[in-house]
Swiss-Prot record:
This is Formate--tetrahydrofolate ligase. It comes from Streptococcus pneumoniae (strain Hungary19A-6). Pathway: One-carbon metabolism; tetrahydrofolate interconversion. The gene is fhs. It is an enzyme of class 6 (ligase). SUPFAM superfamilies: P-loop containing nucleoside triphosphate hydrolases. Belongs to the formate--tetrahydrofolate ligase family. ATP binds at residues 65-72.
Length: 556
């Protein structure tokens, strides 16, 4: 079998102008980045707003192994399969962060014969969105430090600045730094740090903004820190939202590419789901819904993180809610959740599949709490056995959830036809009745407890002293009606990454609450979740190279 990069390089791409023609998009509607990538103009986005709204399919997963369970691959393959059975379909997914690409994941544009192309460009610099977000974020940092240096008219307390610099890399050495050293000419010394770009509030804002004016409004609302009198300081107070929006004026426009089978795809925005809301841009998803009969999108990590945030944070900003949720399961992840060691996941173990099914069952139950029908997709691997697949299908039948085997990695669109047909049938026969998990009018504590009790199945939430102080500050400032964005390990329902399967009656500790007023939510930090990842002992970068003719090697 060829590698992902070898498959991608063997495909003859169509000009993006030809790919999107069937959607009613013309050459004049595009801002081209070469022959195969483009941004969609705001004029076209506004022109299609009066079109009917299509069906929305959300792809999520069970709690994953470190390698991931193939959500992006299944999302792409399902869309290709829907087109194959005659459904006018688009994809709306996130763009990869270079940090994980160079770190543990390698490429992140699907895999096998279910990829978005050109995958090398998408995984590297693409259309420059990550660069623009990084630049806007760091421009704000520079403007804050300049304000301190030039007399600090706003009386910002340099000990209470929340805003950090960012870089689109995994670099643990930058988590804590000191800036402003070198004497009076070089600024005011203070502690600072770097997050990864996709953890920046500006990334979340870009993915939730509906137009330039909304972008500016959200940027102005960012709280960068506090004054000496403990009152908040915003970007609006600094009067620099216009400059930041200027840097982002092109990045806010959705990017158009294609799959191996020519399915048009929006690849736009990429916040992490363990430290942010984990969904692609509202603008891309909404536009796809107006252009196609079916839109397939995904949310990061397991359904306890990405899907919950999609349904509680993103969906209220969309013209419709999901008509179906596809939960991706792999036998290796089920076995891991059933207690099998990572080095034994390729060995047949039917009993471990039975034990690990508790994890999948809980995710199905949780999706149903939102009033949306679920479909299970078994992402097929060569190590899967007939006995394991049979047991999983039997277990799914026992909870009355449709299940299909999908081999889109190996077989492309054809490998997803059965899944596509089942999803279409499920949508037709089981209309969704979407409802949010909680009302925003609940207190901060009540909203967090609702997520912990209903989705994670924990029994108690412990608020550390720092978070209690922050809750009082949030209430005092009138921010307590915002939704909650949980920052939690992706490997477990709990805040302990080693508590696999379906733990119950555990306690979760909230160590910090960070208001993200521009994004419009409050981040609740649990466990040891890092906003700047580190590299593994053997990073994927060690396998990457480029030949003298520019051919890329090693992106999986």
């Amino acid at each position: 079998m060829k590698t992902d990069i070898e498959i991608a390089q063997s495909i003859e791409l169509k000009p993006i102008v030809d790919v999107v023609e069937k959607l009613g998009i013309s050459y004049d509607d595009l801002e081209l980045y070469g022959k195969y990538k483009a941004k969609l103009s705001f004029d076209k986005i506004r022109a299609v707003e009066s079109n009917p709204v299509g069906k929305l399919i959300l792809v999520t997963a069970i709690n994953p192994t470190p390698a991931g369970e193939g959500k992006s691959t299944l999302t792409i393959g399902l869309a290709d399969a829907l087109n194959k059975i005659g459904k006018k379909t688009m994809i709306a997914i996130r763009e990869p962060s270079l940090g994980p690409v160079m770190g543990i994941k390698g490429g992140a544009a699907g895999g096998g014969y279910a990829q978005v192309l050109p995958m090398e460009d998408i995984n590297l610099h693409f259309t420059g969105d990550m660069h623009a977000i990084t630049t806007a974020n760091n421009a704000l940092s520079a403007l804050i430090d300049n304000h301190l240096h030039q007399g600090n008219e706003l009386e910002i307390d340099q000990r209470r600045i929340l805003w950090k610099r960012v870089v689109d890399l995994n670099d643990r050495a930058l988590r804590h730094v000191t800036v402003g050293l070198g004497g009076p000419l070089n600024g005011i010394p203070r502690e600072d740090g770097f997050d990864i770009t996709v953890a920046s509030e500006i990334m979340a804002i870009l993915c939730l903004a509906t137009d330039i004016e909304d972008l500016k409004r959200r940027l102005a609302n960012i709280v960068i820190g506090y004054r000496y009198d403990r009152t908040p300081v915003s970007v609006g107070d600094l009067q620099v939202e216009g400059a930041l929006a200027l840097i982002l004026k092109d990045a806010i426009k959705p990017n158009l590419v294609q799959t191996i089978y020519g399915t048009p795809a929006f690849v736009h925005g990429g916040p992490f789901a363990n430290i942010a809301h984990g969904c692609n841009s509202v603008l891309a998803t909404t536009t796809a819904l107006h252009l196609a009969d079916y839109t397939v999108t995904e949310a990061g990590f397991g359904a306890d993180l990405g899907a919950e945030k999609f349904l509680d944070i993103k969906t209220p900003n969309l013209p419709t809610s999901p008509d179906a949720v596809v939960i991706v399961a792999t036998l290796r992840a089920l076995k891991m959740n059933g207690g099998v060691a990572k080095d034994a996941l390729t060995e047949e173990n039917v009993e471990a599949v039975r034990a690990g099914f508790a994890n999948l069952k809980r995710h199905v139950e949780n999706i149903r709490k939102f009033g949306i029908p679920a479909v299970v997709a078994i992402n097929e691997f060569v190590s899967d056995t007939e006995a394991e697949i049979a047991v999983l299908k039997e277990l799914c039948a026992s909870i009355d959830v449709p299940v299909e085997l999908a081999s889109v990695w190996a077989d492309g669109a054809e490998g997803g036809v059965a899944l596509a047909e089942t999803v279409v049938k499920t949508i037709a026969e089981n209309p969704a009745n979407y409802k949010r998990l909680y009302d925003n009018d609940l207190s901060v504590q009540e909203k967090i407890e609702k997520i912990v009790n209903e989705i994670y199945r924990g029994s108690k939430v412990n608020f550390e002293k720092k978070s209690q102080t922050q809750i009082a500050q949030i209430v005092q400032n009138g921010w307590d009606k915002l939704p909650i964005c949980m920052a939690k390990t992706q490997y477990s329902f709990s805040d302990n990454p080693n508590a696999l399967g379906a733990p119950e009656n555990f306690e979760i500790t909230i160590r910090e609450l960070v208001p993200k007023l521009g994004a419009g939510f409050i981040v609740a930090l649990t466990g040891d979740v890092m906003t700047m990842p580190g590299l593994p002992k053997r990073p994927a970068a060690l396998n990457m190279d480029v030949e003298s003719d520019g051919t890329v090697l090693g992106l999986f």
